[in-house]
Amino acid sequence: MGALLQSGNVTPGHLVTWVTDGVVQDGGATPAAQRVLASLRGANFNITTDQPILIPLNFVAFQLTSIIVTNASISLTTAVGGFYPAGSKGGTPVVSAAQSYSALTTPAGLLAVTLASFGANTRFSSTNLGAIGGQLAIWFALTTAQGVNAVADIYLIGTDLT
């Protein structure tokens, strides 16, 4: 492959492929990559009520690959709880209600929670997730609260399948 001798239009965000020496063409869309799909900043780890994580409207279907919790305000020695596809701890858990957050001892700590089988092996969409005002959501709800004021940030990581 040498210098570019002829070029066509390549759609922004698409790959470029060589057709022959000096000629390129549109190579199609970039393969889906993992990224932050949604987040809940300052999630309260001292309550056991629902805390919905709203999925942006542009994600109609996605694969959840991990949930990361970080930036804990204090050492989360007591907090235990999971993630659910519906409010009031409804539906098959995405993350078990027994998930501990005790590994988070400093704001710099990072915990990739353990996805349950449903969380790791499901194509999420409106067929299996609840919604708030037409927006898909995954609910975070503790089984056991920390006992004192505590917050942390939660990030849903996945692949857009829209």
What are these regions (language model features)?
Residues 41-43, 51-53, 126-128:
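Beta-strand-rich interaction surfaces with strong enrichment in secreted/lumenal proteins
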Residues 2-4, 116-137:
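Short cationic/low-complexity microdomains
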Residues 59-60, 100:
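Intrinsic disorder/low-complexity segments
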Residues 138, 152-154:
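Hydrophobic residues positioned within well-ordered beta-strands of beta-sheet architectures
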Residues 73-125:
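Terminal beta-strand-rich extracellular "head" domains
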Residues 43, 62-68, 72, 79:
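Generic beta-strand hydrophobic packing signal
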